[in-house]
């Protein structure tokens, strides 16, 4: 080990059980590391010594840390990424306690901002983890740069925290915090309150946002441990303006409100979780207000059921609302649906898709339908530039390799064009020929001379594709 390149100056005095060092000046490789006063109290057992330090200047950065380890010939230790992103840490305040168990009262200034603390800090002897319990506040800290999140900016908050962190992430945190402001996607949110517990695989608590462009209250639990996942949430949303929050550029005057209840449960491996999903999502009184248009959906109910029938996975997904009634049911696995689509496409249009390596799934039988209504009210409220005053429908099935899809839209209107009687049908015959049919009647705008000469246009398309052809 090389000679340690450090200088130390202090006025020392004390007795058998204590040492006092006043006017300390500590430098490492010419850079000032510490100025202040330290009192060390130690009983017979040296491993339980107690330190009180009044820090007028305590400085730390990655270069200093790395140089110190090199001079001490210590290998295999690296700073956690969040600490590296801080660039440097300058602490002014008091430190009381044992080396691994310290009470802090002061302020940390870093390249990302200043954080005031008053609490107990416990540091892992390997420097790969830490725990803090106490009060933390800041008037401005660049949290996005701390965690390498480009959409996050500055944050100002006041919080009581009991949390742990390892080399890469938070592992546990109990917190009650008031976030006075935080930047996300270039918008500054105000008046956010958090109260809950966070673990690696669980969040349980409440979130409240009372901002000019969103009033949101979330209460509940999300638990995603190794074997089971459960989500139980109650969400109240009012005066939500997606455009004002920079979530979209469309419909700048749109305001949304709703009450949502979510209860979902699943289990198994990540590949099995979707096939084991059960529960519901209920949206009450979804209200859309956009300029002079208002639209309300009294209730949207999504019901998800999964079980095993005759040794096969059976699923039923039902969607019920003022807007749409839909159902998907049968024996299948969600993971197999892309493979089925690849097989069918390759069978009739082999130039488009390569033959899948996975065999066609057995025991696949599913039926589906969807009936829509009141779509014109929704499209008018959202300024989509299209009206659907009629009641579109779609239905079909997949039984083994037998495919059938039918869709009918009585009418679609744009500003100047109307299309009537849109009929779409796709089915295969005896598992050999795939037939596609499309019919529509188009009324062109009469204020256009060319369109007026053409009049109405009827279109009929019929296409057949044969197996391996």
Regions found by a protein language model. Give the residues of each.
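Interface amphipathic segments
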Residues: 1-469
């Amino acid at each position: 080990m090389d000679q340690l390149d450090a200088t130390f100056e202090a006025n020392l005095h004390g007795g058998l059980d204590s040492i006092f060092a006043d006017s300390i000046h500590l430098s490492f490789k010419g850079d000032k590391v510490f100025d202040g006063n330290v009192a060390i109290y130690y009983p017979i057992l040296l491993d339980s010594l107690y330190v009180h330090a009044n820090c007028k200047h305590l400085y730390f950065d990655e270069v200093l840390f790395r140089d110190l380890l090199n001079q001490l010939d210590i290998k295999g230790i690296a700073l956690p990424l969040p600490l590296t992103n801080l660039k440097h840490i300058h602490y002014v305040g008091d430190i009381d306690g044992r080396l691994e168990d310290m009470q802090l009262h002061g302020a940390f200034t870093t390249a990302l901002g200043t954080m005031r603390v008053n609490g107990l800090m416990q540091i892992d002897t390997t420097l790969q983890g830490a725990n803090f319990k106490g009060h933390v506040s800041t008037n401005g800290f660049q949290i996005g740069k701390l965690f390498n999140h480009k959409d996050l900016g500055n944050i100002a908050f006041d919080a009581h925290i009991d949390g742990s962190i390892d080399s890469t992430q938070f592992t546990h945190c109990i917190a009650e915090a008031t976030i006075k402001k935080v930047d996300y996607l270039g918008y500054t949110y105000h008046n956010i309150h958090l109260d809950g517990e966070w673990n690696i695989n669980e969040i349980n608590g409440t979130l409240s946002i009372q901002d000019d462009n969103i009033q949101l209250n979330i209460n509940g639990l999300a638990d995603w441990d190794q074997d089971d996942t459960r989500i139980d949430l109650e969400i109240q949303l009012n005066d939500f303006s997606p455009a004002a929050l920079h979530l979209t550029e469309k419909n700048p005057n749109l305001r949304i409100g709703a009450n949502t209840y979510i209860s979902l449960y699943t289990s198994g491996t990540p590949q099995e979780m979707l096939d084991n999903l059960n529960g519901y999502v209920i949206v009450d009184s979804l209200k859309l207000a956009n300029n002079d248009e208002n639209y309300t959906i009294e209730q949207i109910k999504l019901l998800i059921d999964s079980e095993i029938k005759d040794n096969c996975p059976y699923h039923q997904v039902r969607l019920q609302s003022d807007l749409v009634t839909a159902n998907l049911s049968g024996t299948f696995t969600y993971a197999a649906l892309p493979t089925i689509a690849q097989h069918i496409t390759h069978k009739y249009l082999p130039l488009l898709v390569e033959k899948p390596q996975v065999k066609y799934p057995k025991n696949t039988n599913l039926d589906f339908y969807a009936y829509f209504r009141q779509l014109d009210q929704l499209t008018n409220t959202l300024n989509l530039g299209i009206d659907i005053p009629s009641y579109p429908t779609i239905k079909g099935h997949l039984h083994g390799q037998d495919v059938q899809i039918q869709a009918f839209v009585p009418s679609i209107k744009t500003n100047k064009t109307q299309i009537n009687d849109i009929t779409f049908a796709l089915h295969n015959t005896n598992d050999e020929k795939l037939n596609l049919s499309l019919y529509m009647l188009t009324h062109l705008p009469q204020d256009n001379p060319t369109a007026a000469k053409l009049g109405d246009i009827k279109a009929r398309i019929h296409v057949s594709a044969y197996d391996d052809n």
